[in-house]
Structures are given as structure tokens and as C-alpha cells.
């Protein structure tokens, strides 16, 4: 199957955005496409069942972008994990903040650069990063992400990553669409010395906002 795309128009942070994403989640690059641009770019090391997930603009990612569009991060170094289409990173970059977008699928980095160009902003730096083999040159002031608790093991992996990558004075912000592993994540965070505040932005819906910081 040849990879197909579509453009999505939306308003976030007081401006309109044109975002290129996969036309559907039932896609994977052909061998010809991999060879034409290089397997590293296409994320050939990612399983077919997971590969398209990094190319879709999910509701939790839109909510994360809306949140960071209204918050201040002057002088802070920000990392978005599991960025996918990385709308939040694009919004932060458009506001002049120091942000790095990261994902285990290098294809996300290609979309990031294309969407930055579509919206006439500098492309945020992209870092290929996974929970299992994280690379952190120095800790971050702020770590953000959306729908990062998609598997049972993610609760421990994300917590361990925060211990490694978040400054003692730093904070994390995650948007979760209602995954069953949030309670385990909260317990794991508390055991590791973190505090976690959970907010339901819309009454009656499952989506949650998690704000995390280290105990003093």
C-alpha cells in the first residue's frame, strides 16, 4: 500500500494550523517507498501495527497543544515525548520556546519538518527516543506528552524516564484519553517520589490531564 496523506485545518493558540497526517491508520510504507527515502526515515524498525500511530493527529494531542498554547515557559527547556504529529511542539516553537520533539518512530520527524514548513515556522529539533533505550544529554525543565500510557508496561517505563530526564525542579504534563493504566502510573510515581495531580477537563468524559513534579 502506498502511504496516503490528508491535510487537517484547525485553530490552536490564536492561529490557524494546516497539519499533514496519514489519511488512515491502516497504512505502512511499501518496500519501494522505504528504498526511495531510506529505511531510517520511514521508521522501518517499528512494527506495522504501531507504525501508523505516529502519523495521526489524535484528540489528546490536540488538547495538549491547546494547554501549552496558554502557558508560559520562558527560559525553560522542553521535551515532548511520543510526539507523533507533534502539534504541541509546533505550537511551542511558534511561540519562540526551546522545545525538542521526540518519538520512537523516525517517521514522526519527517512529518514534523513538513508541518513546520507548511505553517511557516522553524522546525523544532527532533530526537529519536524510546523508553527502553532513552538518550538524555541533560535533564529538562518540562516534559510533555499525550496518550503515553497505551500499554501496561508504560507506567513503569515513563516513570523511570522521568526520574532520568526531569530536573529536580522540573514538571511534567501529560494528557491521557482514558487508558486503564493511569492508576498504576500514579502509584508508581508516588513510590518514586513524585507528586501527581489529575484533572478531568470535561465532566463525564474519560480524558485526564496529569501534572507531575518531584517532591522537594
Regions found by a protein language model. Give the residues of each.
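S-adenosylmethionine-dependent methyltransferases
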Residues: 1-216
